[in-house]
Curated annotation (Swiss-Prot):
This is UDP-3-O-acyl-N-acetylglucosamine deacetylase. GO terms for molecular function: metal ion binding; UDP-3-O-acyl-N-acetylglucosamine deacetylase activity. One of its GO terms (cellular component) is membrane. InterPro entries: Ribosomal_Su5_D2-typ_SF, UDP-acyl_GlcNac_deAcase, UDP-acyl_GlcNac_deAcase_C, UDP-acyl_N-AcGlcN_deAcase_N. Zn(2+) binds at residues 75, 232, 236.
Length: 294
């Protein structure tokens, strides 16, 4: 199996979650060993996708360089990871990726339009060799060795609609599209009101998020899945783990995980080369892994 990029450039326009302004997103092919590179066309700044370039994880994953940032990258990255794309230029003309409907479904459709093409250099993946855990009180995120890739997530909210939800994704591209991609981000009405008072979440609406008051979901169409909340947490986790820089084989597990804990997990993983092994997908032993991205 070889490294990939997209067949042709594609673009879309959507609303930025925090500023509420229109943002154009454009994806362009890159050659082998380029990696994923974000580019802000409004200020002519390129920001490679690296854990060291993460500058904020409070409400979204934010990367930055030389004082310029790009926010809310995790939904876009989640789709890119699920499609197994290794090399891509991601261009925005503002300081955030458009939120679209709050899921990664629009980005999956954009990648379907672009198409995926193999290049001339073997694809590299990371095999997790040791268990790595980052814990804060009851909350934790963990990676452990496995022969495949699973994402398991548990959330607990003192809300009658959410309560405790658990989900395990046996990762393949198709399973991701069927089970995860349409799950939307969510928030509580009192949080949205507070953020807007601070000049944030100006683009947030029932069109791009699940919003809950103290008792119910306010979106008139309801939920896409009964457990849409935990499914979206897996969507976020996949996007955050893309900061590793390549697809990996191992189990991801989280209890009340967050962007911040996911970032700390990638740093903990990468700080010791004994934690992982980078392998090239070049022989019969890797055929099963290829099926995941078919």
């Amino acid at each position: 199996m070889y490294q990939t990029t997209i067949k042709k450039s594609v673009e879309l326009v959507g609303i930025g979650l925090h500023k509420g302004s229109a943002v154009k997103l454009r994806l362009e092919p890159l050659e082998s060993n380029s990696g994923l590179i974000f580019y802000r066309s409004d200020v002519d700044v390129a920001i490679p996708l690296l854990p060291a370039n993460v500058v904020d994880t409070k409400m979204a994953t934010v990367i930055g360089k030389d004082g310029y940032v790009i926010s809310t990258i995790e939904h876009m990255l989640s789709a890119i990871y699920a499609y197994g794309i290794d090399n891509l230029k991601i261009i925005v003309n503002a300081d955030e990726v458009p939120v679209m409907d709050g899921s990664s479904a629009s980005f999956c459709m954009l990648l379907d339009e672009a198409g995926v093409v193999q290049l001339d250099v073997p694809k590299k993946i990371m095999r997790i060799k040791k268990e790595i855990i980052v814990q804060e009180g009851e909350k934790y995120v963990k990676l452990s060795p496995s022969t495949d890739l699973k994402y398991g997530f548990t959330i607990k909210f003192p809300h009658p609609v959410i309560q405790q939800q658990e989900y395990v994704l046996n990762f393949t591209k198709q399973n991701y599209k069927d089970e995860i991609a349409r799950a939307r981000t969510f928030g509580f009405l009192h949080e949205v009101q507070y953020l807007r008072s601070k000049g944030l979440a100006l683009g947030g609406s029932l069109e791009n998020a699940i919003v809950l008051d103290d008792k119910k979901v306010l979106n008139p169409e309801g939920l896409r899945f009964d457990d849409e909340f935990v499914r979206h947490k897996i969507l976020d986790a996949i996007g955050d783990m893309a900061l590793i820089g390549m697809n990996f084989v191992g189990n991801y597990e989280a209890l009340a995980g967050s962007h911040d804990l996911n970032h700390k997990l990638t740093l903990e993983l990468l700080k010791d080369a004994e934690n992982y092994e980078v392998i090239e997908l070049v022989d019969e032993k890797t055929k099963e892994l290829e099926k995941a991205y078919a």
